[in-house]
A protein has these predicted regions:
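HIT superfamily nucleotide-processing domains
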Residues: 1-141
Length: 141
């Protein structure tokens, strides 16, 4: 499925995007976001700047730059929140814009040892708590 960039939440930076996540910062070829739903404490997303459907559409140089951004964010998440593992999800079945979900997993936390849920809808924070998480991530980038 290929979507129109004019209808893409990442390209249009629309209200749907802002309802789901908060932009942390721009990176070299992408943007980092904090998911508002925080069942997986510290969950982030990295979205490629250009409207491409899949990792295999990028040149080697573009792919390496994007994956360096993803790695940079996961390293910051590891330092900020100390999860046991970070799960990577790149599905794009219904939203054809290259992005990676980054879900920290904790031994005693939800779905440890299994696949993370896309949007469990259970844990939402205050603006102050979101800002604190964002600052922790930024300080480790």
């Amino acid at each position: 499925m290929h979507s129109d960039p004019k209808e893409c939440l990442y390209c249009t930076n629309n209200q749907t995007l802002h309802d789901l996540m908060i932009e942390i910062c721009p990176l070299s070829v992408s943007r980092a976001f904090l998911f508002k739903e925080q069942t997986y404490r510290g969950r982030c997303l990295v979205a490629y700047n250009g409207h491409v459907n899949d990792l295999n559409e990028l040149s080697d140089e573009e792919r390496n730059a994007f994956m360096a951004d993803v790695t940079r964010v996961t390293r910051a998440m590891q330092k900020a929140f100390n999860p046991e593992k970070i799960n990577y999800g790149a599905y794009s079945d219904k939203l054809s814009h290259l992005h990676f979900h980054l879900a920290p997993k904790y031994i005693d936390g939800p779905d440890y040892g299994g696949t993370f849920q896309m949007n469990p809808g259970k844990v939402y924070l205050t603006d102050a708590e979101y800002n604190e998480m964002i600052e922790k991530i930024k300080s480790n980038l």
